């Protein structure tokens, strides 16, 4: 990506090589392949440098659009401050009702927009159900034929439910969006010099050993 600078201001952002007119002269797209950095800059064409220091994980934050600035002989593309996504549900209010914004079937206090916590807890429930589904046949067989469920399976299923409940509690108790992000962020918990062990505070749902 490049930018065209004229009289000290960026007048055009060039996303890919293309022909262009600068002043009264038309230049081929080939200049982006054949000309040196200095030759391009002599015509006011500068390669864009990306500053991602303000850009955050879009699972947790809403990033701003990039803005472009020319200073010190270079064009920099950067983001403004990211906004954390709402961790709690947004509810319909009395004012919403007065303004006629609440849809049919909903009322004051109902969820208008789900927050991250609701979505994450739903995912935990789905993941736990998916793991338990692998051993559901033991339960079906017991109901149909009276065959006892192995104790290892019973223990595993209980462990899945227990861990899922712990995860849901941790999510519920998170104070804000950065706290939720921390729960899901993997860090190396190994001692220095040992092979890396990547773990997250939220932990993992148990898997049945083969």
Predicted regions and their residues:
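Secondary-structure edge/capping motif, primarily at the C-terminal ends of alpha-helices
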Residues: 135-146, 167
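Interaction-interface detector
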Residues: 1-133, 165-210
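Residue-level recognition of alpha-helical structural elements
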Residues: 117, 145-149
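Short, charged, amphipathic alpha-helical segments
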Residues: 150-158, 181
């Amino acid at each position: 990506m490049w930018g065209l600078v004229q009289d000290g201001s960026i007048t055009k952002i060039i996303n890919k090589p293309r022909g262009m007119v600068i002043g009264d002269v038309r230049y081929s797209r080939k200049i982006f392949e054949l000309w040196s950095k200095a030759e391009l800059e002599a015509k006011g064409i500068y390669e864009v440098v990306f500053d991602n220091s303000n850009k955050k994980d879009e699972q947790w934050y809403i990033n701003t659009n990039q803005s472009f600035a020319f200073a010190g002989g270079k064009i920099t593309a950067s983001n403004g401050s990211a906004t954390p996504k709402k961790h709690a549900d947004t509810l319909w209010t009395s004012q919403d009702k007065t303004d006629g914004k609440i849809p049919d079937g909903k009322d004051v206090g109902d969820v208008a927009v789900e927050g991250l916590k609701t979505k994450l807890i739903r995912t935990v429930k789905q993941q736990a159900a998916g793991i338990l589904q692998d051993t559901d046949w033991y339960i079906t067989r017991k109901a149909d034929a009276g065959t006892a469920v192995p104790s290892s399976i019973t223990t595993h299923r209980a462990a899945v439910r227990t861990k899922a409940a712990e995860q849901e509690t941790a999510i519920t108790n998170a104070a804000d969006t950065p706290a939720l992000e921390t729960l899901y962020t993997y860090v190396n918990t190994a001692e220095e010099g040992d092979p890396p062990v990547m773990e997250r505070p939220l932990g993992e749902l148990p898997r049945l050993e083969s």
